[in-house]
UniProtKB/Swiss-Prot annotation:
GO cellular component: extracellular space; follicle-stimulating hormone complex
Known role: Shared alpha chain of heterodimeric glycoprotein hormones. These hormones bind specific receptors on target cells that in turn activate downstream signaling pathways.
Gene: CGA
Chief location category: secreted
Family: Belongs to the glycoprotein hormones subunit alpha family.
Compartments, record wording: Secreted
Protein name listed in UniProt: Glycoprotein hormones alpha chain
Length: 96
C-alpha cells in the first residue's frame, strides 16, 4: 500500500472528530479517532529466547494520537486537551 496508508473495512482513517460530550454550541471540542497500522506475526526464535515470558505472537501497532492540541478549561476547573491535528504514532496505552 502506498506510504503504508490503507483503510480497513469498517474502520475510518485517523482524523479529528467532534467530542459531543464536551462540546458546547459555538465551542466544539475535538479528539483524534480512527485506525492506524497494526500487524501480528510469529515471534522469531532468537527473540523468544531473550523473553522473560516467551510469547508465540509478536504484534506491532501505531495509534491515532494528537500531533497538536490546545489545553482548555471546562466548568468546575476541569482541564482537557482539544486536539487540533492527528497522526499515527507510538501507542502509549496498551491492554495487558
Amino acid at each position: 500500500f502506498p506510504d503504508g496508508e490503507f483503510l480497513m473495512q469498517g474502520c475510518p482513517e485517523c482524523k479529528l472528530g467532534e467530542n459531543r460530550f464536551f462540546s458546547k454550541p459555538g465551542a466544539p471540542v475535538y479528539q483524534c479517532t480512527g485506525c492506524c497500522f497494526s500487524r501480528a506475526y510469529p515471534t522469531p526464535l532468537r527473540s523468544k529466547k531473550t523473553m522473560l515470558v516467551p510469547k508465540n505472537i509478536t504484534s506491532e501497532a501505531t495509534c491515532c494520537v494528537a500531533k497538536a492540541f490546545t489545553k482548555i478549561t471546562l466548568k468546575d476547573n476541569v482541564k482537557i486537551e482539544n486536539h487540533t491535528e492527528c497522526h499515527c504514532s507510538t501507542c502509549y496505552y496498551h491492554k495487558s
